[in-house]
Amino acid sequence: MLKPKNVIDREDKGEIVEAEGGGTMTKVYCTAIVLAAGSGKRMGTKVHKQYLQLCEKPVLAYSLQAFQQSDLIDEIILVVGKGEEEFCRTEIVEKYGFFKVQKIICGGEQRYHSVWNGLKETKAGYVYIHDGARPFVNENIIRRGYECVVREHACAAGMPVKDTVKIVDDNNIVSQTPERKYVWIV
């Protein structure tokens, strides 16, 4: 979650919300940028990951649903691949009633281009950036992220790796094995 330099508490979005563990906090306008412009080449399927069916629903719909249902999220900006805008509008956004999706925009050549395209469309406030092919985001993650940003001004959701990770040099020779306790995936 990013905090742009022009963060303001909007008059119409300054409601008080409960904080985890008790207490309250003033709600700042929040935008979720959901990235769904990837082609999933590494996966090797004909259908992009975000559109694969999971329990009869596209994977992307689960990500959108979590942000749609969160009282912390005011709007969603959906970033999709070129030419997929209308498909996403009709087959996902309208079909599943994701009314918080305010804009469907085209992604860029690389992930960071897609993020930048989304950021250019946001209003002032806090911004969540989420990979639409990761369907297991939930209210707890969203709320904890919000609380972390209020305290620390930036945050990334992640978890420790379970696998052994190796660092290689330019010749693909293992040069290091970092301790797992220092390696997280985000």
Give the positions of each predicted feature:
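Short beta-strand-to-loop acidic/aromatic patch adjacent to the donor-nucleotide binding site
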Residues: 125-133
